Amino acid sequence: MKGGTMVENAQYLDASASAPGSTTPLETAWIRVREKLKSEVGEVEYRTWLRQIVLGPLEEDELTLYLPTRFLRDWVRSQYEERLQTLWRTEREDIKGVELQVKRGLPEVSMGDAEDGEDGSGEGHELATQAAAPESRSDLAVPLDPRFTFDTFIVGKPNEFAYACARRVAEKPSSPGFNPLFLYGGVGLGKTHLMHAIGTELTRTGKVSVAYMSAEKFMYRFIAAIRSQSTMEFKEQLRSVDVLMIDDLQFLIGKDNTQEEFFHTFNALVDAGRQIIVSADKSPSDLSGLEDRLRTRLGCGMVADIHATTFELRISILEAKAKASGTHVPSKVLEYLAHKITTNVRELEGALNRLIAHADLVGRPVTLDTTQDVLKDMLKAHDRRVTIEEIQRKVSEHWNIRLTDMSSARRARAVARPRQVAMYLAKQLTSRSLPEIGRKFGNRDHTTVMHAVNRVTELMDQDTSFAEDVELLRRMLEG
């Protein structure tokens, strides 16, 4: 009993064993789940990754399955957990969830290079005698995404250098000074897009062989080759390509054996005049945890940084996506999204896609109100205070004036009107007094601030377009 709840069958059943003479209902269901898994993924994949799962207890409505190492647990969780959940719920209505856990001391079918010192598997265990068959080259790499081309990549100041470098490599692979090409920047800024674009461009003629994969997949393929005693075939497959692209290299930090293999693959390809393209979240010199010799080699070619997007670039990306969709999205909605989602282009595009899908499904146009409603989970307000500095920055961006104009003595309407709006929003959205607000705007008198507030209020009543601009800014600042 646990907490007054019956625990069903805590006896463990090895996933590779046949059913004993007398089995419990849970064990019988597990046998059926295993057989379905095996038929879905194939014998080779089943023996490679799923054979070592061990049945654990069913407590309340949650079933526990055990694996011998953390590496195996993480891999099964990322690749098969959803399917395991579905199969178990189909077999047993009383099972609502499946939890994968590591249990030390279970029989381990040779994990080889598990790349994880914490799970007890270490690196260099005895290789399995029953293991996966070697993979063909088509299985080794990931297919290129046809959506990611140079034509669909929106260029702006933050990414123009990386784009130019990618273009050069696509036109003349292995050019002096461009091998390797190392692209780095934050998540969702376009590194993967550029890599796929290079690959797509190079493979159009059919004369260049390209292999693209994530660093994580490189490691898993390497481990599978060790376990299947086919490392030579793995090496030959990778070293026979004309262009090798490895995405998210930072994944190899701390994976010493895989780093070693990648280093030798890197040298073999470059020495043979083949092109290497790598991406990471940091520059080679900042990837602490990678071997020094590998960092040095990565930095000896062309290193291109993709900077965070600007407001103008985000607008361009959204406009292009909206146009391609065929759905009308008001410019004020695009501006709102560009102001709100500033760090991740992937998330920005995802937000727009969700809006467009919603408009298509419900048959209603996209508006600011529907945008806030549909995307409330993405745009929910953070627990923070709006500052006058933030208001000044947002208003300056919106009307394309210099931030210094907020505190300058310039009286031209193109400057004075945005300054008045910023004062109005400072009064509405902060707890600062009028004199405090005035000091933030070039030491202006409190009466000047009051005049600005009254003037903006009047204009909002008279000019619908102006009122919409102010309302857009208020919504962006409030969250």
UniProtKB/Swiss-Prot annotation:
Where it sits in the cell: the answer is:
Cytoplasm
Q: Quick one: where's region Disordered?
A: 106-137
Region (Domain I, interacts with DnaA modulators) spans which residues?
Answer: 1-94
Q: Where is this region: Domain III, AAA+ region?
A: 143-359
Subunit and partners: Oligomerizes as a right-handed, spiral filament on DNA at oriC.
So what does this one do? Plays an essential role in the initiation and regulation of chromosomal replication. ATP-DnaA binds to the origin of replication (oriC) to initiate formation of the DNA replication initiation complex once per cell cycle. Binds the DnaA box (a 9 base pair repeat at the origin) and separates the double-stranded (ds)DNA. Forms a right-handed helical filament on oriC DNA; dsDNA binds to the exterior of the filament while single-stranded (ss)DNA is stabiized in the filament's interior.
Q: What is this protein called?
A: Chromosomal replication initiator protein DnaA
- Annotated organism of origin: Gluconobacter oxydans (strain 621H)
- This protein's encoding gene: dnaA
